[in-house]
């Protein structure tokens, strides 16, 4: 989405290669030039699920020039353990060039409403208000988001179901002998060898996953954690797609 947003504004983007399927913060800092205006960082990252702790992330933000805006996309933050969840909003007082982006589409379960929010310095908010689209999020979506924001019990239950589903899929992949990237989100990046072939086989079996060749990961598929029966269906279909003798075990 970041390249698309960049191109839509007529800007030129610089993609910094990943390191160990995660962000290379040192390389990102080195890639900043006098022409750089915005840096996007997703944490936890999509589609790899890798995560950078708060101390390292704040150090990165502190080293970005003040005239460059840092957009910290924390769409999957609620899936982290409570002790690991980001405190980046408290950094804005020290780094007025920081925008923290959150969404209600993941742990809050409001994906169909397409609503999220950004927290930033008032001066940055004023600039965004001048250029944003004239039609804002509809009033029903706003009301739902406000109600969801106050329902901490639901969010914690959502995170718990996700942790249990993650363990279920990880155990199933281990039985199939399939490698995956440990994830801090609500999905797993799974190494199936030939992503396009296995994606097509799963689709024929009625299971939809996400191919990620466009991220430079043609051997992988991204699999969202579902309910227990959905996870089992995926694992069985994956076993069939891979021709595993354990698929029907």
Region annotations inferred by a language model:
Residues 13-16, 38-44, 70-74, 181-183:
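Short beta-strands and strand-loop turn motifs
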Residues 112, 184, 216-219:
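Short acidic/glycine-enriched loop/turn segments that link adjacent beta-strands
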Residues 7, 23-34, 47-70, 74-107:
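Active-site pre-lysine segment of PLP-dependent enzymes
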Residues 55, 59, 201-205, 210, ...:
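PLP-dependent enzyme catalytic core of the Aspartate aminotransferase-like
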Residues 97-181:
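PLP-dependent aminotransferase class I/II
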Residues 1-41:
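PLP-dependent aminotransferase-like
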Residues 18, 162-163, 171-205, 221:
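Conserved PLP-binding catalytic core of the aspartate aminotransferase-like
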């Amino acid at each position: 989405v970041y390249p698309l947003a960049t191109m839509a504004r007529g800007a030129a983007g610089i993609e910094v290669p990943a390191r160990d399927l995660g962000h290379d913060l040192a390389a990102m800092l080195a890639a900043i030039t006098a022409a750089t205006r915005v840096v996007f960082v997703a944490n936890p990252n999509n589609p790899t699920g890798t995560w950078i702790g708060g101390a390292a992330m704040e150090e990165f933000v502190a080293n970005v020039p003040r005239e460059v805006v840092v957009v910290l996309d924390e769409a999957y933050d609620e899936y982290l353990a409570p002790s690991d969840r980001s405190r980046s909003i408290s950094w804005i007082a020290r780094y007025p060039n920081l925008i923290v982006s959150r969404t209600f589409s993941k742990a809050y379960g409001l994906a169909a409403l397409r609503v999220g929010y950004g927290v930033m310095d008032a001066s940055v908010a004023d600039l965004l208000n001048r250029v944003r689209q004239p039609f804002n999020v509809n009033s029903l979506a706003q009301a739902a988001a406000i109600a969801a924001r106050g329902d901490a019990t639901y969010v914690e239950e959502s995170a718990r179901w996700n942790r249990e589903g993650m363990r279920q899929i990880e155990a199933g992949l281990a039985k199939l002998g399939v490698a995956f990237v440990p994830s801090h989100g609500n999905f797993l990046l799974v190494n199936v060898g030939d992503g396009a072939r296995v994606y097509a086989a799963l689709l024929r079996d009625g299971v939809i996953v996400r191919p990620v060749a466009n991220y430079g990961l043609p051997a992988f598929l991204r699999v969202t954690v579902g309910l227990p029966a959905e996870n089992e269906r995926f694992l069985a279909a994956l076993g069939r797609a891979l021709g595993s003798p354990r698929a029907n075990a």
